[in-house]
């Protein structure tokens, strides 16, 4: 898999955090904690598939943000801000891949 394709797929996975959080906030059992853990496992594993990610500050920031969200409660506005911030970062990273 090409790095740009992975980052695009990951951006979609990060976006999915929004409806899952909203469904959970509305009382549905969506297993958000399991989804976040699976997402983190994938992101950490990707650092072996794409070694350049391991030293990329933007990528590490996204991983750290997901880890924070896994352990701490957030307001709706904070959750949305974090998700859209991560999506923006991943989108910029994809742009860098195309420019190379």
Language-model features: locations:
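Short terminal alpha-helical segments
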Residues: 1-33, 87-92
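A sequence-composition feature that detects small, non-aromatic residues
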Residues: 4-5, 46, 54, 70, ...
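Amphipathic alpha-helical binding modules
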Residues: 63-100
């Amino acid at each position: 898999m090409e790095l740009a394709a992975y980052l695009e797929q990951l951006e979609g996975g990060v976006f999915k955090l929004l409806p899952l959080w909203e469904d959970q906030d509305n009382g549905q059992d969506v297993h958000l904690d399991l989804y976040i853990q699976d997402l983190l496992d994938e992101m950490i594993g990707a650092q072996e598939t794409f070694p350049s990610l391991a030293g990329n500050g933007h990528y590490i920031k996204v991983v750290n943000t997901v880890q924070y969200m896994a352990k701490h409660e957030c307001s709706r506005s904070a959750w949305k801000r974090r998700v859209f911030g991560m999506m923006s970062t991943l989108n910029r990273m994809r742009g860098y891949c195309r420019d190379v």
